[in-house]
């Protein structure tokens, strides 16, 4: 079964309110998992950070890339998502055709859900939230390699009848199946 843009968006919406713990990819946080994450990320896991994270023991937790990895089943970090993206576009070119694409800046990733909003696992003090795209200094929009962006596109509708040619001087007849004469 393919992973689609709509599926990714629905997954992200279902994770709103999920606690953020750096390195977590959707698993239930246990003391053993917390200890492993602290060993793997000693620069992040200060004693204060560990104390905050310990409050989430027994709950499913995510970090920013874990929000996406939990849906795709492929563990990647934010830089890996950037490097494996099918397309990378400047954030200045974000438009509504990019719903379900990832928003990226060095060290952080979120998912564009449309109308100027994204869902991101923002940090241990915020958790997984819906936020305005303009509230974070995103740099790029990424078309993710693990998502099928064609599966849930609306079908193309052709209108049967005469259509003007590009030169504006001739006409052609288009059938409802898209063929023409």
What spans do the regions from the language model cover?
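Aromatic- and glycine-rich peptidoglycan recognition patches
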Residues: 1-18, 76-96, 107-158
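Aromatic side chains
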Residues: 20-22, 112, 173
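Enriched - but not universal
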Residues: 104, 141, 174-175
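N-terminal capping segments
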Residues: 1-65, 69-74, 106-108, 119-125, ...
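Loop/turn positions that initiate beta-strands
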Residues: 97-101
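Intrinsically disordered, low-complexity, compositionally biased regions/tails
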Residues: 27-30, 70, 114, 127, ...
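Extracellular adhesion/carbohydrate-binding repeat motifs centered on closely spaced tryptophans
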Residues: 151-181
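Short, repeating "repeat-unit edge" segments in beta-repeat architectures
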Residues: 105-109, 166-168
